[in-house]
Amino acid sequence: GWTEWTQGFQFGSAILQFDATDDEQFLEIGRRNTIERMAPHVSHIGVHDHGFNNVSTYGNLRRLMLEDRISMDERERDFYDLALKVSGAVQASRWSTTADGSGYVYSFNGPHSLFCDTIRSMRSLSMAHQLGHSLMDENDGSVSLLDRMIQHARSTAKYNVYYGEGRDSYDVRGRVAHESIFNCNDGRYRCPSTQQGFSPFSTWTRGLAWIIAGYPEQLEFLQTVSDEILDSLGGRDEVEDMMLNAARA
């Protein structure tokens, strides 16, 4: 069922429990279940949850190995790397374009739906990019995962986050709409919506937390990306200002 997206938390939390306590039983729980039960999440084309699921499991195991918290095994690390590369590309393939020439990774509701949650799955695109991967598309076209991450971050900041600048009568600085709805035929923005919040015109607090956590994650990641690469994507100043404004709103 759709609630299986929480398996990333379930097994990832065991890995973090080991990280905090050095209790080997939690490492065993997290590692075994990641290997035995997380593969469907890596290739899942129907959700926006790759960051929650795969970075929380494969990503944390890889991190612990690189930090010498667990023994280094090159083949095991290759396994984690492959999972993270595939996850980022699969997540990036779930793409809708917008009328302003940008786009977003759409939610499990369908191509019309941009969730604020998904900013925290941009981790999967960023990690896959950092590992040298891209999304291969029709006619062997190579799609930059970094580009898609930044486009998604821009769209979320533009449509889901409110800045108190008079956008509409509900534009209160710091308000976050859980969901933005688009016309799939022409990519035009239609209205705010909500999957789990009280209403489209209130703030879903958990969604606000995703914004507050998700943008700083990407700001930290951007410190590993060269100015030269970012120049073709709007420039470091513009990209970082956009993310910082969204996180602070």
Model regions and ranges:
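Glycan-recognition and catalytic cores of secretory/periplasmic carbohydrate-active enzymes
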Residues: 1-249
